[in-house]
């Protein structure tokens, strides 16, 4: 059978919090089968757990948060969640000694390296996928996102930013998902923001960790980072990275075709909640062997070496 995945060993890294600008220690721990993805704040006494759950997601101006019933939150979970989706990690406990996951370089790549360093372990329990059975679409003005049935996982994302630096690059990106494709084509794409917004937020004591080290920064005309872009179309690739993380908030890889126009964290989450709320639109599936498994989810040699 296709088995659930966790880590082989505990790994740790430090980074800076996007909101506070303070050092954050991140610890990734293996977890038993059917634990799911658990985010944990160890700066609170007692520590507070936040299971990845579409209904717990709140979209703020700067990031995605998970919020519990007592209104306690953990922030900036989206890029790490994308790395978990990319490598198909089903069970993990993610600890931080702060209210937020460190921003690292603004992409998912540092988290991918950390997960690969921990090693991927297979558990003796069937991996559950969410398979889309009916088309589900959500809209917000001219923005929309939808899932259609498809035996694999494809993503097709279009952005529409009126900016010289972004107009010059492609505003649409489509891919057949796989762990290899995610690592090579998506994981290194960084988040982006306007210099004037960062300066304004920092003047109000917000976004204190925001810098050229953790984002693509643009003014009204150009990219300000000395090293430029990692991809010509890094902006739309990062929006796809965000979507992969947002859609994995159900804790399972999804089998279906995702298409979006001008979508963001809030609309991606609205789509996920709409799918899960419509019982006839999806089902849990497991696979007995590799031959049945959609190509998208076959483990690359780098992951299970």
UniProtKB/Swiss-Prot annotation:
Catalytic reaction equation(s): a UDP-3-O-[(3R)-3-hydroxyacyl]-N-acetyl-alpha-D-glucosamine + H2O = a UDP-3-O-[(3R)-3-hydroxyacyl]-alpha-D-glucosamine + acetate
Active site per database record: 265 (proton donor)
Domain of life according to the entry: Bacteria
Pfam (any one): LpxC
Coiled-coil zones: none
Single GO cellular component term: membrane
Names of the cofactor(s): Zn(2+)
Annotated binding of Zn(2+), by residue: 79, 238, 242
Family the UniProt entry places it in: Belongs to the LpxC family.
PANTHER family membership: UDP-3-O-ACYL-N-ACETYLGLUCOSAMINE DEACETYLASE 1, MITOCHONDRIAL-RELATED
Protein known as: UDP-3-O-acyl-N-acetylglucosamine deacetylase
Name of the gene this protein is made from: lpxC
């Amino acid at each position: 059978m296709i088995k659930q995945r966790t880590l082989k060993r505990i790994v740790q890294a430090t980074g800076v919090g996007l909101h506070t600008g303070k050092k954050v220690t991140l610890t990734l721990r293996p977890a038993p089968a059917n634990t799911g993805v658990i985010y944990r704040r160890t700066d609170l006494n007692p520590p507070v757990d936040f299971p990845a759950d579409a209904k717990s997601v709140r979209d703020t101006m700067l990031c995605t948060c998970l919020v519990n019933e007592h209104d306690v939150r953990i922030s900036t979970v989206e890029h790490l969640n994308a790395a978990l989706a990319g490598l198909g990690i089903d069970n993990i406990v993610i600890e931080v000694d702060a209210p937020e996951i460190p921003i690292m370089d603004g992409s998912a790549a540092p988290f991918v390296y950390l997960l690969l360093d921990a090693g991927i372990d297979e558990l003796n329990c069937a991996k559950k996928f969410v398979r889309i059975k009916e088309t589900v679409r959500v809209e917000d003005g001219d923005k929309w996102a939808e899932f259609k049935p498809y035996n694999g996982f494809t993503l097709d994302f279009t952005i529409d930013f009126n900016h010289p630096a972004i107009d010059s690059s492609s505003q649409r990106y489509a891919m057949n998902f796989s762990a290899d494709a995610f690592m090579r084509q998506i994981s290194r794409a960084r988040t982006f923001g306007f210099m004037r917004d960062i300066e304004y937020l920092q003047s109000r004591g917000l976004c204190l960790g925001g810098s050229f080290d953790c984002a693509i920064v643009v003014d009204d005309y150009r990219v300000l980072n000395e090293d430029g872009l990692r991809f010509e179309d890094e902006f739309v690739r990062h929006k796809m990275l965000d979507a992969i993380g947002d859609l994995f908030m159900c804790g399972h890889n999804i089998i279906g075709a995702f298409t979006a126009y001008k979508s963001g964290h809030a609309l991606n989450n609205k789509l996920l909640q709409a799918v899960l709320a419509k019982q006839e639109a999806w089902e849990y599936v497991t696979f007995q062997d590799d031959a049945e498994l959609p190509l998208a989810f076959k483990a690359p040699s780098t992951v299970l070496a």
